[in-house]
Amino acid sequence: MMDFDKKGILARAKEAQASTVVMDEGLRAYMLKVYNYMATGILLTGIIALISFKMSVVTDSTGAITGFTNIGNALFFSGLKWIVMLAPLGIVFYMSFGINKMSASKAQTVFWVFAALMGLSLSWILLVYTGVSVARVFFITSATFGAMSLYGYTTKRDLTKLGSFLMMGLIGIIIASIVNIFMKSSMMYFVISILGVLIFVGLTAYDTQKIKNMYAVSDSGELLGKKAVMGALTLYLDFINLFIMLLRLFGQRR
């Protein structure tokens, strides 16, 4: 009887170990796909932003902006700028509410379109800040994001309660930002930027853990593909917003 129990225990232990190995390998592949999509999206955004900026401005031999092309006038000073600014937000809502009806390949395509439109909408950054300071803040953002995402992936602490607190904070700074459009307070602008950095640093860890916990071995390849795209979209938004908040604090204006 004892031998039978030992064999049963060993068999269950081996089965559990095998399941853990499958889970670990699948989770790593899933998270790698999320990060690859996100990184490619950011790269696409950066390329489109740079091309849009170069096509929009006229510069002298020193690189100083001396005027705008027809593209620049349309992109920065006409009604088109509102379409360019709001289109990515529309796509975020479209993906958030329509992902269940999409195929994984369509979700990827929509994500690439979103990243490209974000490049157009963020091209103003190169108009306001020097290229050197943009590059510097980008590397600071990358290091900060990487550290917090790693923490979110490896920590055993449940960050669910932190997520609720951060979402309330996010709503707060959105409202404050709208109010400050009319108040034009430099102090409020500074405070919003500080709080924004703290909130998106926290959201990076929280969202990484949430994306990790969404993985399930039993999911089909199609479902995992859509989860990876939505995870990439979430982390992309965390990265971009953290980048903008840090740029407000450390960016050097032209």
Where are these regions (language model features)?
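A hydrophobic alpha-helical transmembrane-helix feature that marks the membrane cores
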Residues: 1-254
